[in-house]
């Protein structure tokens, strides 16, 4: 089952999501740990280096990246064009964008990464936007919270990975890999399931 919070207006949803990232105390804390958290993200991608290495010269985007540690981690692994996206931009490596209405051209992106599927108010639209933007044989790496309670900013609950997989198939994706997350660190302990989707 995929459950979604009832929010009357899309503008209210946007305001809710920006609230966390624009909080000055949180931003100060995140900025202070930027280098430390970047290093913690490296094993997340390194475990699939044999799958992702072919995208090192492609456009790569980390969606809902806040301060963009995941994009910096990918840059350190040789993905020179990796950037984060968020409703609130940050420095030079996180650009402003909306996951439900992405600015990228059709079939232009090699790889997407995201761990904020639970922050999507319209999961089918989110997946459809990723599918639209990916090149043929492009990949989308999702880290999911399965069966976890929502925090204040989460709007979507996933009870079973099969629910996500079925929705992804409906959009047109092929399931490249689906497995329990084996690389758990203090910053990603709630992300208990990894799925890699492919556009064919």
Locate each region found by the language model.
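Short alpha-helix
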Residues: 155-178, 193
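A short acidic, Gly/Pro-enriched loop at the edge of an enzyme's catalytic core
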Residues: 100-112
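Class I SAM-dependent methyltransferase Rossmann-like catalytic core
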Residues: 1-52
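A short glycine-rich, Lys/Arg-flanked "PGG" loop and its adjoining helix->strand segment in the class I
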Residues: 124-139
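A short SAM/SAH-binding and catalytic strip from SAM-dependent methyltransferases
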Residues: 110-123
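Class I SAM-dependent methyltransferase SAM/SAH-binding core
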Residues: 58-101
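Glycine-rich helix-loop-beta junction characteristic of Rossmann-like nucleotide cofactor-binding loops
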Residues: 48-56, 102-103
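Conserved beta-strand signature within the Rossmann-like core of class I S-adenosyl-L-methionine
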Residues: 137-147
